[in-house]
Regions:
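Conserved aromatic-histidine-acidic binding/catalytic patches
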Residues: 17, 44, 68, 106, ...
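Amphipathic alpha-helical interaction surfaces
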Residues: 35, 39, 58-69, 82-93, ...
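Membrane-proximal low-complexity regions enriched in glycine and acidic/polar residues
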Residues: 74, 79-151
Length: 185
């Protein structure tokens, strides 16, 4: 996060964040995903990790102030930690040091890899999209910003992931109606 790169991700949040308090509260963390993913080096990983921990705590406060249910906040936090950890792990600097042993998912959920559970959560929430639309939209943005989880390493994983993204977008449109799909970086 040394320097901000324009990946178009800010534009991705316009549609949903105006209708979705969860996405609006998560914007700083969602915006950090491409910033981290595209950074070639980071001089102070410990400080970056602490800034993200502090921002996750602010996210939780914003969600509580908005009256969002605890389960939604925890689910969103899990997905955000997983996406941020993956973004860091895929950088030249993130595969060693702070993130290799003490990612955000470990800090907040005492887990080391959420690449499977992220999609299990998506499958569960997809059973009742109207009830879970806020979190489904936030998951959609994590995917649009490049999160791949277990599909990164599976044979034909990217094709499977594209199918998941398409189904998720159709589900969201089914609940929200038509508005232009968000831009993907």
């Amino acid at each position: 996060m040394q320097e901000r790169q324009d990946t178009g991700s800010d534009a991705a949040f316009t549609g949903a964040s105006s209708n979705n308090q969860l996405v609006a509260a998560a914007n700083p963390l969602l915006n950090a995903i491409p910033q981290i993913r595209h950074s070639v080096s980071h001089d102070d990983q410990v400080a970056l990790r602490q800034r993200l921990i502090d921002e996750i705590r602010r996210f939780e406060v914003r969600c509580q102030q908005a009256g969002l249910p605890y389960e939604v906040i925890v689910g969103a936090r899990y997905c955000l930690c997983t996406a941020l950890d993956e973004a860091a792990a895929l950088t030249p600097w993130g595969s060693s040091g702070v993130w290799s042993s003490n990612g955000l998912l470990v800090t907040f959920h005492n887990e080391t890899w959420g690449g499977e559970k992220f999609f299990q959560l998506l499958a569960r929430l997809s059973q009742n999209p109207r009830e879970h639309i806020l979190l489904l939209e936030m998951i959609n943005y994590c995917l649009l910003l490049g999160f791949e989880g277990r599909y990164r390493v599976l044979d034909n994983g990217r094709t499977q992931l594209e199918t998941i993204k398409q189904r998720l977008w159709q589900m969201i449109r089914g609940v929200r109606g038509s508005y232009p799909p968000p831009l993907s970086p």
